[in-house]
């Protein structure tokens, strides 16, 4: 792949105003700038809308609120984002996570070198020092594994063609199921660097 690629970053959100600001600042500060940010808020919230108004002059940001609240772990919201995403690679994340400034550039560099790569995953740290109910040292490193419950949804970028028509089930463990469903066509590459901060 020699052309510049576009990322679609799908953000599911529910009333985390300050946290979402941190995420947006981390994305808008990326060294690689060819992306769109799709923010889907779960239900109508005027305060959330007011907070978002300061960002909506940037035409890379697509923002809307669903007419009703789904309260289904963000799965319906992720599917809405997937349906409108126009990028070559998709990143799904939550409104309280954030990324290092070089994250998209690192992924882009891999995709340029590895022409068959359609799934890029990377290391993360947990700001709250816990992972899967186990106490960790401050900013412990979490090496992802490609199986259910061992990789966070925000910890990888998948090619849109790989995802195809696959969508999230409305289920608590739907993140893991989604990854398992795209595994069969996956040609992954692992970046051994911390690019994602999980909250």
Task: For the regions a language model picked out, list residue spans one by one.
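Glycine-rich, basic loop-to-helix element that forms the pyrophosphate-binding segment
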Residues: 67-85
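Short aromatic/hydrophobic "clamp" motif used to bind/position activated sugar donors
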Residues: 90
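Conserved donor NDP-sugar-binding/catalytic core segment of glycosyltransferases
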Residues: 104-134
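Conserved nucleotide-sugar donor-binding catalytic segment
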Residues: 141-199
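Acidic donor-binding segment of Leloir-type glycosyltransferases
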Residues: 24, 28-68
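Cell-envelope/extracellular polymer assembly enzymes that use nucleotide-activated donors
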Residues: 5-8, 36, 177
């Amino acid at each position: 792949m020699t052309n510049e690629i576009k990322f679609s970053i799908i953000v599911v959100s529910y009333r985390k105003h300050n946290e979402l600001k941190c995420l947006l600042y981390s994305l808008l500060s990326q060294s690689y700038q060819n992306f769109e940010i799709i923010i889907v808020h779960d239900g109508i919230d005027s305060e959330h809308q007011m907070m978002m108004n300061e960002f909506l002059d940037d035409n890379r940001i697509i923002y809307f609120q669903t007419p009703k609240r789904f309260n289904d772990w963000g799965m319906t919201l992720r599917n809405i984002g997937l349906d409108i995403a126009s990028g070559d690679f998709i990143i799904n994340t939550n409104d309280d996570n954030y990324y290092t400034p070089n994250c998209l550039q690192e992924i882009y560099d891999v995709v340029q070198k590895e022409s068959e790569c359609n799934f890029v995953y990377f290391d993360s740290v947990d700001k709250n020092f816990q992972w899967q109910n186990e106490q960790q040292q401050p900013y412990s490193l979490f090496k992802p594994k490609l199986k259910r419950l061992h990789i966070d949804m925000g910890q990888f970028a998948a090619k849109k063609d790989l995802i195809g028509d696959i969508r999230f089930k409305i289920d608590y463990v739907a993140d893991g199921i989604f990854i398992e469903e795209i595994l069969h066509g996956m040609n992954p590459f692992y970046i051994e660097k911390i690019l994602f901060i999980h909250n």
